[in-house]
Amino acid sequence: MGALRPTLLPPSLPLLLLLMLGMGCWAREVLVPEGPLYRVAGTAVSISCNVTGYEGPAQQNFEWFLYRPEAPDTALGIVSTKDTQFSYAVFKSRVVAGEVQVQRLQGDAVVLKIARLQAQDAGIYECHTPSTDTRYLGSYSGKVELRVLPDVLQVSAAPPGPRGRQAPTSPPRMTVHEGQELALGCLARTSTQKHTHLAVSFGRSVPEAPVGRSTLQEVVGIRSDLAVEAGAPYAERLAAGELRLGKEGTDRYRMVVGGAQAGDAGTYHCTAAEWIQDPDGSWAQIAEKRAVLAHVDVQTLSSQLAVTVGPGERRIGPGEPLELLCNVSGALPPAGRHAAYSVGWEMAPAGAPGPGRLVAQLDTEGVGSLGPGYEGRHIAMEKVASRTYRLRLEAARPGDAGTYRCLAKAYVRGSGTRLREAASARSRPLPVHVREEGVVLEAVAWLAGGTVYRGETASLLCNISVRGGPPGLRLAASWWVERPEDGELSSVPAQLVGGVGQDGVAELGVRPGGGPVSVELVGPRSHRLRLHSLGPEDEGVYHCAPSAWVQHADYSWYQAGSARSGPVTVYPYMHALDTLFVPLLVGTGVALVTGATVLGTITCCFMKRLRKR
């Protein structure tokens, strides 16, 4: 026997296997979704179909057939991309009307669309692709089962009353105040035998606008995965807790919009969508229904807030009490959880522009405060009725005369305790006249002795005369100085040196020379200022400023008048002998001549000043 040798394949066999393998990789394949698919009667359905591994032109043709359960072997032509006469009679009218159509996505992919499913549309759908290949290899059609479910989704407005009451047949019209809560309920249920999820959302359309996807603005909704999501304009309010959505029981959903705003007005709808999970794991919406919940009007505070004042123009005397009443009116929500109010009084002097300055106010918590310049006075601001506020000045002054206005502000509460001003209103002006005290003051001041020298004490006297005024008038006097700079008075305001108040208490300011100062009352209407150890820095123009004060019944003081004396010049002279010691460093003889010259000059100047005076 000869040795065994391995059997060699013919050279053409490996090549043939490779060709067969390559042809298998390029075999035609038609792909449709995995079934069965569940859809609801009356809704739209889309079934995709695409082909791969084909030969021939890039644009392939597609034909759709239906095999009904009662005739599983009978193919009913639905629609074709090639033949317009392809449809069987049962589909012809629907195809012509566009209710059933095939839409090409690209050359090798299409989608079958049925606008409104009917119960007889259930069955096996086949997508067939006529061959354009050189050899018949692969699959030329794909099949998927479609099951049509009855429409059992129900959506309606939830009745505001207890369970069991029927919702009204027509949508109600609701009116809420700005800042109040807007609460709406929706009933959504389904009895589909398959496992489905409901997504429920609340939407709003502007008043009188037609309802549609383009006009309906989503407020908030619960998705099919139970996540709560708000529409873009409401996302911030949802995050802040002003917007809430919850499920009560098995089929009731409740939306609460806290702190209603003017932009919340409109027609509210509830939309329920039923979702099912297809065999490929994706979720598909199989039904959707919408119900009108209510037509909502938001009554803004700015359109309702009104302020009136009384009792009318007032004329009173100084020291008399002044009472003014302010009434806040309008269809307003009560102060509390959703709304808050503040009320204040403003006063502007007669003829002054603008509302003026704040006198007193009650804030949103009912805490009173006085405006700048009114501290220390007996002024009361109180609430005397549900919407009536009273301002009382225990003792009016002439400076209280002017135009009074009452200012009311309305606030709404946002999330937590945050307040947002929603409206404000001012009353008409209320004139108040206060008689003047009729006090006339005059003051005469002079330097005692006429001439003062350095190191001495300068005494300045001020006599005050008074005409008119009530009994018990008190006088006060203060001394002021203006310093010269380069021979002229400085533009700096006068500086207080000292004075005696209406209560007899002395007040000391700052003396230019820094030495001791004394102020005293030397007579009923005579005041004296003394500058001890006078120095060159004390040079200046002094004046006396008296003022008249009246104490009212509330023990507050009111300045009833003031005056200013004429200027008093204080010039500290040097003693003549002091000048002899200045030039000793340059010789005694020169000092005597210089001293005599200076002495003569000073004496001459002094005599000239006396003659001028």
From Swiss-Prot:
Domain Ig-like C2-type: 28-149, 162-286, 303-424, 431-560
Protein's membrane topology: Single-pass membrane protein
Gene that produces this protein: IGSF8
Residue window of motif EWI motif: 274-276
Sequence intervals crossing the membrane: 580-600
Major place of residence: membrane
GO biological process, one term: cell motility
Residues with lipid group (S-palmitoyl cysteine): 604-605
Organism whose genome encodes this protein: Homo sapiens (Human)
Tissue expression summary: Expressed in brain, kidney, testis, liver and placenta with moderate expression in all other tissues. Detected on a majority of B-cells, T-cells, and natural killer cells. Expressed on dendritic cells.
The protein's name: Immunoglobulin superfamily member 8
Keyword Protein biosynthesis assigned: no
Stretches assigned to the Extracellular side: 28-579
